[in-house]
Amino acid sequence: MYLDAGTNNETYVRDPLYVGLRQHRPPTEELYAFVDEFVDAVQEVFPNCCIHFEDWTGSDAIALLARYRNKVSCYNDDIQGTGGVTLAGLINGLKITGGQLREQRVLFLGAGSAAIGLANLIVSAMGQEGLAPDVARQQIRMFDTKGVCGEFRFRRELGSEISRYNAVAKYTTQV
């Protein structure tokens, strides 16, 4: 089953090969009400199915997964699948190098839903190795098109420039 709520990308709307719904997506509140109705209907007809939220925008992907994860069987491969496979690679790489995940500092090049999902899994895995979540989060940084996200970005926007090279050198993973 495929749920299409439209697109706000004008290039897609004008593209004759675009197969999606050629209208703007509704505002968030209206969109989520529509998804609520869809999820309720699917659960009524197929109560044991798993709903896969595929290719939603980053903030919507995270919000929808959080909204339904304790209500229905649901999954987002960008957030959960990519994160699970990548975390497995990190853990197995550390078996070769002899390190522990809790000792690593990780820099993400990108701060989308896949990166956020993986970062959350890394925090959880570091927790299983005895590291407190707030300490684990301090070992993770995200770098997007505007630079390093979080504390460093605020400093930069206030005028205290931090070079991207130094950010990468300080927070690069050692795996």
Could you say what each language-model-derived stretch is?
Residues 76-175:
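Glycine-rich phosphate/diphosphate-binding loop of Rossmann-like nucleotide-binding domains
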